[in-house]
């Protein structure tokens, strides 16, 4: 997506002296786009159930009970009921997402993540790709990416490698934490797709509103580099990253991308959305 965007920009008049770069960027973009197929993960409902059961077994009792009581999609059954066999409309066709990477045997590392934000903002995804991204954001963690304080950047619940649940937890910089700039990029990307996929405007608007509400729930932490969360109180609660003994790194309170939200407010207003326009 980034290469394709670069190619389009290099075709502008001010870059005409760089004659070969636009074609090379677009050629590489096409090659990488075709290489995405091995990264696609598609799980059947029975596989989703089993992998979620395995993941929940790695959590504390308090975490597990909280997640089991949460709904699987809007109006869906509780996660406990789904694991016991109840049908969840949001998962009737299973669950698809892009793998985090490929392993040494070129097999997908089945960790769900939020990097589709780049595709939404810079790429030309088809309807199916946009719907796949929306589905991940419509589903609460650990089924999807969304928490009450923003989308996590990685969800290891579906990985067959038991190390990932441990190494990509709430204390890991690249784990089940919320990155402010990634969430902002997803919002900007969906605002763009709102124009390109008019038949999906209703779903996109609901996800955009949810993204905004969740970031507001993070309060002052929403302007920091990243934050983690807890559910021990019986609800989602944003927590500063790097403060706990289990944290593997620390967070810088304010970085350049912390200033991205005024631009997003402008885009919201341009789109005529009746969502909260202030943070």
Residue positions per predicted region:
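Acidic, mature catalytic/reactive cores of soluble proteins
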Residues: 1-279
């Amino acid at each position: 997506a980034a290469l394709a965007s670069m190619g389009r920009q290099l075709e502008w008049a001010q870059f005409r002296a760089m004659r070969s770069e636009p074609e090379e960027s677009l050629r590489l973009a096409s090659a990488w786009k075709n290489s995405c197929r091995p990264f696609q993960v598609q799980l059947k409902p029975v596989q989703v159930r089993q992998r979620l059961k395995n993941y929940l077994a790695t959590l504390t009792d308090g975490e597990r009970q909280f997640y089991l009581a949460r709904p699987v999609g809007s109006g869906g059954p509780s996660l406990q009921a789904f694991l016991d066999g109840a049908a969840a409309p949001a998962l009737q066709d299973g669950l698809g997402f892009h793998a985090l990477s490929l392993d040494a045997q070129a097999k997908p590392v089945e960790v769900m993540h939020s990097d589709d934000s780049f595709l939404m903002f810079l790429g030309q995804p088809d309807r199916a790709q946009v719907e796949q991204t929306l589905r991940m954001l419509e589903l609460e963690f650990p089924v999807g990416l969304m928490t009450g304080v923003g989308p996590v950047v990685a969800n290891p619940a579906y990985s067959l490698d038991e190390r990932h649940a441990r190494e990509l937890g709430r204390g890991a910089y690249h784990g089940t934490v919320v990155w402010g700039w990634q969430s902002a990029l997803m919002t900007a990307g969906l605002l763009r797709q709102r124009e390109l996929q008019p038949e999906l405007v209703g779903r996109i608007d609901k996800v955009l509103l949810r993204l905004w509400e969740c970031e507001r729930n993070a309060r002052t932490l929403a302007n920091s580099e990243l934050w983690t969360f807890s559910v021990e109180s019986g609800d989602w609660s944003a927590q500063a990253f790097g403060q706990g003994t289990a944290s593997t790194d620390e967070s810088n309170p304010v970085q350049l991308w912390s200033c991205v939200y005024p631009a997003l407010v402008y885009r919201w207003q341009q789109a005529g959305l009746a969502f909260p326009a202030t943070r």
